[in-house]
Amino acid sequence: MLTRIVLFAITNLAVLILASIVMSLLGVNPTQMSGLLVMALILGFGGSLISLLMSKAIAKHTTGAYVIEQPRNPSQRWLLDTVRRQAEIVGIGMPEVAIYEGPEINAFATGADRNNALVAVSTGLLQNMSQDEAEAVLGHEIAHVANGDMVTMALLQGVLNTFVIVLARVVGGFIDSLLSGNRGSGRGVAYYGIVLVLELLFGLFATIITMWFSRRREFRADEGGAYLAGRNKMIAALERLGINHGQSTLPTQVQAFGIYGGIGEGLRKLFLSHPPLSERIAALRMARE
């Protein structure tokens, strides 16, 4: 967590400097509300939308996943056939299907377009899950694609980013004015230091909101997996994950869209993208009754 906070601080400092340069070149005054909103919208949505558009390429690069063009064995043929069948049921285009090296049981889906997505599974999943369990996991990922979760998460992140940028600067300006005793003075080093601290603080709250929404999204994807593969298969798949549990080794760029997001206790649970497996299994069983 400390490493992430340090990296977040460095990134925000770089963004502050870059934003000031860009706004100066464009003739936009970021200290005025209109200029602040322009800057916040550009920075807030720019990063999340670029990440969304590049999500497939980023996922392939960070995981080393290779796309199955022509199946080399029955397992790969089964993967393609299952994904194709499930995609047809929910009415989306056939996603690219990929495999990445990893001992953990996991899979993920990503892509900016529900008709041009990517579904990838780990070698650990293929080695440790039955076909019934793997079918449910694939259904879970196809449900993410069909529900448009990648786009929704990007838009939510953009809104929260914009909120953090605006609020940090408004509150930062107020605090700086109180400390300096001069509400009309220009912004100095202290102001940017205050803004950086506030962005860290508000950014943590924004992350909690994003992860809460992500956990709600997982329940819906589980329901989608139950619809596509069968409720018992989806429950069995989650139980298998519980037996072979551990910390997720997926890169952070795609971790939110994996079938499994790791475990956590106490406050750390607020920052998890996935609910506890026990809660997901209980939700599926309650829906069946």
Curated annotation (Swiss-Prot):
Protein EC: 3.4.24.-
Residues that bind Zn(2+): H140, H144, E218
Pfam families linked to this entry: Peptidase_M48
Keyword Protein biosynthesis found: no
Keyword Heme set for record: no
Mode of membrane association: Multi-pass membrane protein
Cofactor(s) recorded in Swiss-Prot or TrEMBL: Zn(2+)
TM region(s), chain numbering: 5-25, 33-53, 155-175, 193-213
Gene Ontology biological process: proteolysis
Protein localization: Cell inner membrane
Sorted UniProt keywords: Cell inner membrane, Cell membrane, Hydrolase, Membrane, Metal-binding, Metalloprotease, Protease, Stress response, Transmembrane, Transmembrane helix, Zinc
Coiled-coil parts of chain: none
Top-level EC class as recorded in UniProt: hydrolase
Active site (record annotation): E141
InterPro entries in the record: HtpX_protease, Pept_M48_protease_HtpX, Peptidase_M48
MF-aspect GO terms: metalloendopeptidase activity; zinc ion binding
Cofactor remark: Binds 1 zinc ion per subunit.
Predominant cellular place of this UniProt entry's protein: membrane
GO CC terms: plasma membrane
Recorded family membership: Belongs to the peptidase M48B family.
Designated name of the protein: Protease HtpX
Organism: Xylella fastidiosa (strain M12)
Lineage: Bacteria, Pseudomonadati, Pseudomonadota, Gammaproteobacteria, Lysobacterales
Gene name of the encoded protein: htpX
